[in-house]
Amino acid sequence: MASDQRDTDFSAESPDLEEDGGGGGGGRGGGETESDEDVVIPEPNEAEDDDHDPDPDPEYEDLNSPSMISRAPATKSSSGTVTVALPAGSAVPVASIPSDSDQKWHRMTEIVHQRPPIDDSRRLFQRLWTDEDEIELLRGFLDYITNHRGNSSHPPDTAPFYEQIKSKLQLEFNKNQLVEKLRRLKKKYRNVMSKFSSGKEVFFKSPHDQATFDISRKIWNQTGKIIGFEDNNVMDLEETNHVNNANGSSGFNVSVIGNANVDVDSENGLEKKVTISRKRSRSRIGKIDEDKPVLAPCDGVIPNAVNLNENVAVGCDFGDGRNLGVLIEETVKNCVSPMIKEMMNSTTGMMMAATGGFPGGGAHALGVLSPMLMPSMNLGFGGKGVGDERWRRQQILELEVYSRRLELVQEQIRATVNELKTMPNGG
């Protein structure tokens, strides 16, 4: 019974098995196929991509990206060296990497080639002014202060002068540079004047320095404080003896310029040969605001090699308008006038002629005789008594005139001395 039952079951299932497997051998093969339907065997390349990259499409992958390079497996060989395997097509030669990619190199290049702009403070110390520019600047400033002369309360301003001189000079400069240049030229002039006052013998080193000093003397011998380049730390030479009275006007103002054994210019009474010191005078004396002109020694004939330490020109200004300097100047002019020298020469010649000869030879005496005396001396040698008498009388008359003139000069000197002694603020 049992065997029949198994046969019945087998026969009932056999048609299905025959349809599916197609025989006994096919039935086993069909069983394997049915059990393997849910198993997917990946391809070798797909398995590798699934393990490392979720995106299987290599089209969107950057070949030079660090992720692609770090993705390559590294193996260590037996020799101790490390071999890095790169994916196909992702290796980039080192030479092809641009040098501009280094940001540090960019910064260094910019620092080397970048030049900071030059500010005004650095331009002040550069050589902007040539010798011709200095002369033109001083001449223009002299004309400006002559036309715009200010007093103690309203001195001339340098702002209009800057606008005026800017169009005349062929260079670019600002007002600060102009003020600095004028201040340096003023200090340069004061250094020369300080050497005069100390009695030192100095000489100009170039014609340009001579011309600069001449123009500067005309500017700063007559001006006090000027707006725009005041330098109150260093006073002018003519400002050292300034005295203010109670009313605020200038009192007894004396200016002395002296030097020993130097050549003197008869036009302005100052030395023509001086030297400019490289050191700058920085003496702190005081402060002055008013105009103080300096009187030259005199406008008369002055011999060369005059010792100005002994022959001093003194200018005195009284509060009531009288100018003592003019009086002294006229007195000195009378003392050293050509007529006085002619009188002295004539007197010397007459004394020598009266003795009957010329000591040491006639050439020495003839050198000091005036042309007016020569005809008389020739007549005296010729033995003509009438001519000698006429010349003698003429000389007596001339000497009397000179004597009276000397008396007038002495009276003026005495009156000046008495005036100085009786002045209330003369001390």
UniProtKB/Swiss-Prot annotation:
Residues 22-32 have a biased composition (Gly residues). Residues 1-81 are annotated as: Disordered. The modification Phosphoserine is found at S14. GO terms for cellular component: cytoplasm; nucleus. Residues 33-62 have a biased composition (Acidic residues). InterPro entries: GEBP, GeBP-like_DBD. One of its GO terms (biological process) is defense response to bacterium. Keywords: Phosphoprotein, Transcription, Transcription regulation. Pfam families: GeBP-like_DBD. GO terms for molecular function: transcription cis-regulatory region binding. Coiled coil: none annotated. Belongs to the GeBP family. This is Probable transcription factor At5g28040. It comes from Arabidopsis thaliana (Mouse-ear cress).
